[in-house]
């Protein structure tokens, strides 16, 4: 739970009164030299996230007309489930176990313990997004022009508005609304060159940190390093595309090792990922 502004002000006031407190306050304000910003998950934006009650199983009734794609039980492979009336989205863990030598904690001018946790959480979110785009690739790779799924749209760079409009049309012909477009920064550079006449560019820093860079014809364009280069994914609304059942949300457990004099943490989440509507996805494959 986050502290209120009044509580924060009181803590700061108490720390300022002593030399040790001022040193601690100064250390908390120092930031390490970073290679890049911490990763923020964007894959969940195109799935309906559901917290599972204790004892509940991630079982869903499925339209027999559509094939469901799920991440396997160990999170290793993608399964295609076609005929059953019900489908279970297997749960799997994504974990990170940072370890910090106790001697390093005092040597750093920043909060090393908090930074280690932030990095671990960031990498877990990046790994989760990797599984999301693997599912999208599985759907697109099995797609045919059968009126239910949408075959890939080949594109010779640069990407043009007319090509992306065709991708929108593939989804909208199924009475679905396009809500998200996922791109790598290398491919988004083509879209950025369209200018403000086509693109409604977001400039707020808080939005940029979440991966949201622009709106196009009512849909959000989200950019991430986890999106494969030379691929763009156009997706329908979350409730019509898939589910992410969550048994255990991102959790931090203490895993210290006194004999090795290390401070450790076990950071993990237990989730499932499944897409039940292949018609809600269209993939552009770009040749450069």
Annotated model-derived regions:
Residues 1-36:
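N-terminal alpha-helical "arm" segments
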Residues 2-6, 10-13, 194-288:
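Sequence/fold signature of self-assembling virion shell proteins
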Residues 89-100, 282:
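A short glycine/small-residue-enriched secondary-structure motif
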Residues 140-212:
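Extended, solvent-exposed, turn-rich assembly/linker loops in the middle of proteins
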Residues 99-101, 181-187, 235-237, 277:
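Helix N-cap / beta->alpha transition motif
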Residues 93-97, 178, 262:
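Broad gene-expression machinery/nucleic-acid interaction feature
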Residues 24-94:
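Assembly/oligomerization interface modules of large self-assembling protein complexes
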Residues 99-173, 286-287:
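Alpha-helical scaffold segments that mediate packing/assembly in large oligomeric complexes
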